[in-house]
Each structure stands twice: as C-alpha cells, then as structure tokens.
Amino acid sequence: MSQIKDRVEKLIQTNPVMMFSKSFCPYCKKAKATLKELNVEPGICELDEDSEGRAIQDYLKEKTSQNTVPNIFIKGQHVGGCDDLLAAKDNGSLSKMIAAL
C-alpha cells in the first residue's frame, strides 16, 4: 500500500487541483464541467482506466473517509465530491480556493 500511498500523495501535491474520477461517472463529468467553467484544468486520475484504480480508491477511502468519486483536492486539501464542489462554488469559497492557483 505504501507504493499506492506515495503515488496518490505525489499526485495531490504536484497538481494544484487533483480529481480522482471514473470516466463513466455523471458526478465526475459534472465536477469536471464545473471546474472547466472556472478555467481550472485539474489533474485527473481515471480510476476505472488505471490498473491500480481499486487500490487507489481504497487508499483514498482510508485517507478521506470518502469511498465515492469524484474525490477532489485543491492545493493539497480535500474538498470532497461533486456536491461539495458545487456547494463551495455556490457559497463563494471555491473562487477563493482557486484564486491563488
């Protein structure tokens, strides 16, 4: 698991916005569209297309207590899923988070 942990942590730290996603997930597509509207290009790891996707999702659950996708991080901080991203957009906190990118 330490190899997976190292990989996930590196992705989170090296991408200002990092999304762990599944290519077919409608919530992931909505989150990607929301970020695109804000001119944000997230790093994306499509778990269903990654040979280590299941292990990555297991580690993310351990790290965040969230077992669903999308699983979004901004500047290394866990934001949550699509509903959390949309709530942050609606209350203005998302604009503040991405302003410093």
UniProtKB/Swiss-Prot annotation:
Record's keyword annotation contains Hydrolase: no
UniProt xrefs under CDD domains: GRX_GRXh_1_2_like
Induction of its expression: Up-regulation of expression first detected at 24 hours after exposure to copper and reaches to a maximum after 7 days. Up-regulation of expression reaches to a maximum at 12 hours after exposure to paraquat and returns to basal levels within 24 hours.
Sequence intervals crossing the membrane: none
Record's keyword annotation contains Cell division: no
Residues covered by the Glutaredoxin domain: 5-101
Disulfide bonds: 25-28
Source domain of life: Eukaryota
Localization in the cell: Cytoplasm, Cytosol
GO CC terms: cytosol; nucleus
InterPro entries to which the protein is assigned, alphabetical: GLR_AS, Glutaredoxin, Glutaredoxin_euk/vir, Glutaredoxin_subgr, Thioredoxin-like_sf
NCBIfam families given in the database record: GRX_euk (TIGR02180)
Family note: Belongs to the glutaredoxin family.
Record function comment: Multifunctional enzyme with glutathione-dependent oxidoreductase, glutathione peroxidase and glutathione S-transferase (GST) activity. The disulfide bond functions as an electron carrier in the glutathione-dependent synthesis of deoxyribonucleotides by the enzyme ribonucleotide reductase. In addition, it is also involved in reducing cytosolic protein- and non-protein-disulfides in a coupled system with glutathione reductase. May play a role in protection against oxidative stress caused by superoxide in vivo by regulating the redox state of the protein sulfhydryl groups.
Protein name: Glutaredoxin-1
